Amino acid sequence: MSNWTQADIPDLNGKVAVVTGANSGLGFESTKELARHGATVVMAVRNMEKGEKAEADILKEVPGAKLDLMNLDNADLSSVQAFADAFKQKYDRLDILMNNAGVMAIPRQETADGFEMQLGVNHLAHFALTGLLLGVLTNTPGARVHSVSSSAAFNGQINFDDLMGEEEYSRWAAYGQSKLASPPS
C-alpha cells in the first residue's frame, strides 16, 4: 500500500462522500481528489465563509466538481445532529464518510456539551456522526468510513480517571488521547 497514490483512486461517478473539515489541510486535499475522480463531495465545514473560499478554490482546479457545502461544528453535538438530519433529507446514499475535522494541542476548552475540546471534536463528534449516518451507510453497498488519526495515537494514553482533563491538563496529552480514541489503522 505504500505506493498507492491519487492516481489509484477509482472512478467515483455516482458516489457520495462526506468530508468533515473539508476547507483546509487533509480535508481540502481529500475533497479535491474525490471530486476530481467524480464523487459528489459534501464539504462539512464549521466556518461557511472559509468553506465557500475552499469550494471556489477547488472549482478553479477541478472545473465541474460536484460539491455541496454544509455546516457542521464538531464542537456542538446539536450541530452534528442537524448536519446528519439535513444530509439524510438530501441524500439516500453515502459511499465514503471521511471523519477528518480536528483540533490539535490547544489550551483547555470545552465543547458546547461540556466535553474537553480535543476529545469532543476529534473523537466524540465523529463517533456520533458515524452513528447518526449508520443507516444510510449500511444501505449503501460497499460504503466505507475512514477516521483520520495521527501518529500521536501511538504515544497517547486514555486517562480514565480524568478523561476531560479537569484536574490536570496537558494539551499534547489531551491530543494524544483524542487520537488514540480513533487509532490509525
Predicted stretch roles:
Residues 2-185:
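Rossmann-fold NAD(P)H-dependent dehydrogenase/reductase core
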